[in-house]
């Protein structure tokens, strides 16, 4: 029988995504905390390729066009990459789109690899967009037939996504619930001073319609108080059909009621703000909400399955259906909420015990070791 030590020596893990951002921004800390050091990345080359090469043992360029709904050449390239892997390799796909592309390529893979899929929110495919609904209908039969063969285990971030997807897909393999990707606690500058006047409100997100960027712009028009400043941080996602356009962004830049500040270093800069707004319509487990809580901001979030856990904490307020009047009322009457440094410290203790990168990485380790021994 193989010992745990032997398993770790033999174990090869590959992280797969159709976007380099996924394997850097949300996974780099997990990789650095895993017991197994033999981890490769497969994703298209992009602005984070240089960083990926310093974190993963090897980076393999997946030649795929993110802007296409289905890139046949990209699937063929992935098939060739998968066939080059050693038998027994664990291929961990991140996002539902990547999982679908992997399942297509896997139909033509000859070696015995073990698939794992992390569904970090159901995303575009399960949105109310007409094209998305049509695409979901077309893919339903394929997903039902292929996912049980392609994936030994599927990881969800909340119960609602799990129930919806299992009903849709008929998946019958192993299932795990891991809440988020965790945060590396020592990387963050904590907020030390708290104020109730001259507030700085910030919305940090990819600039997607479903993330609520247009709702946020409407909110800034609702509150005309010289003591409240609004900031928008994030970038257009050209490979996402739900992204705002460059023309939309130029209009935002010309607005007087909100300041667009581009991409920010959340770990080092977010402490400068007072209130974090999350207006997403769909979310697996909101990372920016977790980061905002740990840093010490007051958080106002749309009440969806991926943010509902905010109820555990002191410094948060959930609103229904992004109700602008409810959000405006909280901001305008912020003094009444009495949020303090002591509340922030209490929240940090919860995060240390439940949501740190180390906690999440241990759950990943358990999954990989179980797969290696099966």
Which residues make up each language-model segment?
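A conserved mid-protein helix/loop that constitutes part of the nucleotide-sugar donor-binding site
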Residues: 24-29, 203, 208-222, 290
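Glycosyltransferase donor-sugar binding loop
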Residues: 42-48, 183, 204, 229-246
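Donor nucleotide-sugar binding/catalytic pocket of nucleotide-sugar-dependent glycosyltransferases
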Residues: 60-61, 144, 148-189
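Short His-centered aromatic/hydrophobic patch
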Residues: 93-99, 119-120
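Aromatic "clamp/platform" in nucleotide-sugar-dependent glycosyltransferases that forms part
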Residues: 281
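Conserved acidic donor-binding segment of nucleotide-sugar-dependent glycosyltransferases
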Residues: 313, 317-325, 333-338
